[in-house]
Curated annotation (Swiss-Prot):
<keyword id="KW-1133">Transmembrane helix</keyword>
<dbReference type="InterPro" id="IPR009619">
    <property type="entry name" value="CrgA"/>
</dbReference>
<protein>
    <recommendedName>
        <fullName>Cell division protein CrgA</fullName>
    </recommendedName>
</protein>
<feature type="transmembrane region" description="Helical">
    <location>
        <begin position="60"/>
        <end position="80"/>
    </location>
</feature>
<keyword id="KW-0132">Cell division</keyword>
<keyword id="KW-1003">Cell membrane</keyword>
<keyword id="KW-0131">Cell cycle</keyword>
<dbReference type="GO" id="GO:0005886">
    <property type="term" value="C:plasma membrane"/>
</dbReference>
<comment type="function">
    <text>Involved in cell division. Coordinates growth and cell division. Required for the formation of the sporulation septa.</text>
</comment>
<dbReference type="GO" id="GO:0051301">
    <property type="term" value="P:cell division"/>
</dbReference>
<keyword id="KW-0812">Transmembrane</keyword>
<dbReference type="Pfam" id="PF06781">
    <property type="entry name" value="CrgA"/>
</dbReference>
<feature type="transmembrane region" description="Helical">
    <location>
        <begin position="31"/>
        <end position="51"/>
    </location>
</feature>
<keyword id="KW-0472">Membrane</keyword>
<comment type="similarity">
    <text>Belongs to the CrgA family.</text>
</comment>
Length: 84
């Protein structure tokens, strides 16, 4: 069986040096605290509603208090989309 020709290697060229790039995080320092606050407010709203048997946080809303709690949680997820 015939042997393959050996290819000649090209001269060595060093890889280009990598330069440090600045990563701009933006001025979104408010996002994480607001997001966590919304999550916790929503969770607390629902827990208080169940623990007090519906008399708190707002008695007139009745079972809509659950929707308000989940609304706060959904708003927290909405704020989380701004996190970079």
């Amino acid at each position: 069986m015939p042997k393959s020709r050996i290819r000649k290697k090209a001269d060595y060229t060093p890889p280009p040096s990598k330069q440090a790039t600045n990563i701009k995080l933006g001025s979104r320092g408010w996002v994480a605290p607001v997001m966590l606050a919304m999550f916790l407010i929503g969770l607390a709203w629902i827990v208080v509603f169940y623990v007090t048997d519906g008399s708190l946080p707002i008695d007139a809303l009745d079972n809509w208090n659950i929707v308000v709690g989940f609304g706060f949680i959904a708003a927290g997820f909405g704020v989380s989309t701004q996190w970079k």
